[in-house]
From Swiss-Prot:
Protein name: FMN-dependent NADH:quinone oxidoreductase
Gene responsible for this protein: azoR
Family assignment from sequence similarity: Belongs to the azoreductase type 1 family.
Quaternary structure annotation from Swiss-Prot or TrEMBL: Homodimer.
Molecular-function GO term, any one: oxidoreductase activity, acting on NAD(P)H, quinone or similar compound as acceptor
Length: 199
């Protein structure tokens, strides 16, 4: 049975443009995988704890020395990493907030990036340890940034995902949403979704 991990990072939940496009992807995916399972992480509905010194210390404390609170921190990280490993594909809805990703998504990534678990350092540099799989990024922007120096978001996403071993990355952009181009941008994005699902 195929498994799709859906990550929605919009502050506005299903009302967010990136979430709407990610939901569209999921519905199309279901038609191709009627017996498939969709695992959802919606950061508008769940608390994603930002890393602090206490949490970092928990991740570096040997298992036999952890307190109950530290063990809970590690178990959260272990769980979301296991979800990624178990998925056959990932769809990620990402709005552009102040030229970057939502802070909740950054916090989620911080719990995933663990030396010896999702990446390791070697003499020739870091090596990602996650099993590669398709990652579909539905990027929703109010303005137009694709291909511009100001689009630091796309570069960051590629760099981070590559770092942990995820290299099969597919971007689908919906831009100009606050410039009177929403209908056209959504239609184009949905067409690209159809093409990706059919590929």
């Amino acid at each position: 049975m195929a498994t799709l991990l859906q990550i929605k990072s919009s502050l506005f939940g299903d009302n967010g443009n990136s979430s709407q496009l990610a939901n569209e992807f999921v519905e199309r995916w279901k038609t191709q995988n009627p017996n498939g399972e969709v695992v959802i992480r919606d950061f508008a509905k769940e608390d994603v704890p930002h890393l602090d010194a206490t949490r970092v210390q928990a991740l570096f404390t040997p298992a036999e020395q952890r307190t109950a609170e530290q063990q809970a921190v590690v178990e959260y990280s272990d769980k979301i990493i296991a979800e990624i490993q178990a998925a056959d594909a990932i769809v990620l809805g990402v709005p552009l907030y102040n030229f970057g990703i939502p802070s909740t998504l950054k916090a989620y990534f911080d719990h995933i990036a663990r030396a010896g678990v999702t990446f390791k350092y070697t003499e020739t540099g870091p090596v990602g340890l996650l099993t590669d799989k398709p990652v579909y990024i539905l990027a929703a922007r109010g303005g137009i940034y694709k291909g511009q120096p100001s689009d630091t978001q796309s570069r960051y996403l590629v760099d981070f995902l590559n770092f942990v071993g995820l290299k099969d990355i597919h971007f689908i952009y919906a831009e100009g949403l606050n410039m009177g181009q929403k209908d056209q941008a959504f239609a184009s994005a949905k067409h690209e979704i159809e093409q990706e699902i059919a590929a």
